[in-house]
């Protein structure tokens, strides 16, 4: 940007039109060791990135309205998928804190965004919708995924707070699950919200599960495009699995 060329993007205008957190997100997403570039297109992408993170919190908060400490499920009693996502968010917590400590803010926010897009939006949140919306309110299946959502909320709101400070505080003040702990997210500490896993999370097994899931979804999509079926609910899936795959499906399915 150059004042003489008249291509300067005013931070105050960005603040006024898009909000302080999107300005903060743009700054944090850029490697400060290299040239920082701003344009309407870059700020639009930053806004999209922000909305993805914010919408993730909206989903989580909306599905914890009837959840309290007495509803928590012990880790060993949780559904296997819910154990997996707890392991993933705990791993993210360690990685992001390490990146903050090394001032790698752009890598930290990238990891947070990718987690919201991939592990949550692309896998976990989509799978648990049936349990959240169709199971009995106090059923183990529903309380199990709510326990994991509660853990994700507690960790994720703290992870975004150094960058998306206003959003993190808004989330904190909105949620009784959070504001009952401290008056502000910035007065809270990172606690161990779930005991360290006593169960070995085999990443290779979960990788295979998701590969099988993707293959099934691809076949269903092809059948929808051919007008063989109208939607996934019209399909009956038979999986011809190897002995190893069958063992994994029985264990984690």
Give residue spans per PLM region.
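Conserved alpha/beta core surface patches that mediate binding of polyanionic ligands
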Residues: 7-11, 110-114, 118, 169-177
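Short alpha-helical functional segments enriched in proximate histidine and acidic residues
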Residues: 25, 60, 99, 122-123, ...
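TRNA-recognition modules of translation machinery and tRNA-sensing kinases, especially anticodon-binding
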Residues: 120, 249-252
């Amino acid at each position: 940007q150059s004042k003489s060329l008249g291509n300067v993007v005013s931070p105050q205008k960005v603040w006024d039109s898009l909000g302080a957190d999107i300005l903060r997100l743009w700054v944090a997403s850029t490697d400060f060791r290299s040239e920082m570039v701003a344009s309407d297109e870059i700020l639009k992408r930053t806004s999209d990135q922000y909305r993805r993170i914010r919408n993730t919190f909206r989903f989580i908060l909306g599905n914890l309205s009837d959840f309290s400490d007495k509803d928590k499920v012990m880790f060993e009693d949780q559904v296997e998928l819910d154990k997996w996502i707890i392991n993933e968010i705990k791993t993210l917590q360690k990685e992001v804190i390490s990146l903050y400590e090394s001032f790698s803010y752009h890598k930290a926010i990238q990891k947070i965004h990718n987690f919201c897009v991939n592990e949550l939006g692309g896998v976990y949140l989509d799978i648990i919708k049936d349990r959240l919306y169709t199971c009995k309110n106090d059923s183990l299946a529903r309380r199990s995924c709510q326990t994991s959502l509660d853990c994700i909320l507690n960790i994720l709101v703290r992870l975004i707070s150094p960058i998306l400070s206003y959003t993190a505080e808004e989330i904190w003040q909105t949620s009784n699950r959070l504001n009952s702990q401290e008056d502000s997210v910035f007065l809270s500490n990172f606690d161990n919200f779930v005991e360290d896993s006593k169960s070995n999370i085999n990443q290779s097994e979960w990788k295979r599960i998701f590969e099988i899931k993707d293959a099934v979804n691809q076949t269903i999509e092809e059948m929808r495009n051919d007008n063989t079926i109208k939607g996934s609910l019209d399909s009956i899936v038979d999986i011809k699995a190897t002995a190893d795959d069958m063992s994994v499906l029985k264990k984690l399915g």
